[in-house]
Curated annotation (Swiss-Prot):
NCBIfam families tied to this protein: RhaT (TIGR00776)
Transmembrane segments: 4-26, 33-51, 56-75, 82-104, 114-136, 148-170, 180-197, 206-225, 230-252, 264-283
Gene Ontology molecular function: any one: carbohydrate transmembrane transporter activity
Similarity comment: Belongs to the GRP transporter (TC 2.A.7.5) family.
Protein name: Glucose uptake protein GlcU
Organism this protein belongs to: Staphylococcus xylosus
GO CC annotations, alphabetized: plasma membrane
Keywords: Cell membrane, Membrane, Sugar transport, Transmembrane, Transmembrane helix, Transport
């Protein structure tokens, strides 16, 4: 039962961008609504006594990491509007894993031996190959799609910076868990407002996009529940399966068209993107 619950964060987080697309409204309504939805979960945690105001580090780190999450999510949604979910999510997930792994290795000393460096670089190569495979161009893909892909890549790089800072700021200061989520949700809401401030939004679309934000928050709660039960490494590894949920959801639920060649590339790429972090976790715990 605990292992099944540990799989739920991947299901919920992988569904967030799918729900964003299904309810529509464009990236600015989507990011505003999503961050406000996360704030609703944060307020519920506050009201149930799961937010503590006696640690200034948690408050500041929570606000900063939440704001950078909004940056990452907002630009990810901009990429989705250009190239779709099934192309955006594997690339985005792979780039995030590359960024967080390299940061942890270089600045937090997680690769402290020659064996760890060698195996870690192998994991990075697997990630890069996986990203490339999921990006294979279809035989009959229009030139407009190639132009949009070119526009999406710098957007995804900005998104990656947002997500990586969101993760590593918390790692640096040892801030984690349910106590930080309320402050993160405030940072997210502020970030969402800033990103959408100069763009036209509608109340109706923003309200619909509260749903994916609430779903994201619930995914976090399942993560917090499962970590003590199955361990941080297993919980983290399971959470990376979100890329399968979002990518296949984009193809089969949203109807994003792929030819046989692209489907083979997507499946192979997903396998590598999922295997690489598992491989990194193994080397982290077995080659100290």
């Amino acid at each position: 039962m605990d292992l099944l619950i540990a799989l739920l964060p991947a299901l919920f987080w992988g569904s967030v961008v799918l729900i964003n697309v299904l309810v529509g409204g464009g990236p600015y309504n989507q990011i505003r609504g999503t961050t406000f939805g996360a704030l609703i979960i944060g307020i519920i945690l506050l009201l149930t006594g799961n937010a503590k105001f006696d640690d200034l580090t948690i408050i500041i780190v929570g606000l900063i990491s939440g704001a950078f999450w909004a940056l990452g999510q907002g630009y990810q949604l901009k990429s989705v509007s250009l190239i779709g979910v099934s192309k955006t999510m594997p690339i985005s997930t792979g780039l995030q894993l590359v960024g967080t792994t390299l940061f942890s290795a270089i600045f937090l000393g997680e690769w402290s031996t020659g064996v760890q460096v060698t195996l870690g670089l192998v994991a990075m190569v697997l990630l890069v190959i996986g990203i490339a495979l999921t990006s294979i161009k279809g035989k009959n893909e229009a030139s407009e799609s190639s132009k949009n892909f070119g526009k999406a890549m710098p957007i995804l790089l900005i998104s990656t910076v947002g997500y990586v800072v969101y993760v590593v700021v918390a790692q640096i200061f040892g801030v984690d868990g349910m106590n930080a989520l309320f402050f993160q949700s405030i940072g997210m809401a502020i970030g969402g407002l800033i990103l959408s401030a100069k763009h036209e939004t509608s109340v109706k679309s923003t309200l619909w996009n509260l749903i994916p934000g609430i779903v994201w928050g619930i995914g976090n709660l399942f993560m917090f529940y499962s970590q003590p039960k199955v361990g941080v490494a297993t919980s983290f590894s399971f959470s990376q399966l979100l890329v399968i949920v979002s990518t296949l959801g984009g193809i089969f639920l949203l109807g994003e068209k792929k030819d046989k060649r692209q489907m083979i590339g997507i499946w192979a790429g997903i396998v590598l993107i999922v295997i690489a972090p598992l491989y990194s976790e193994i080397l982290k715990h077995n080659y100290n």
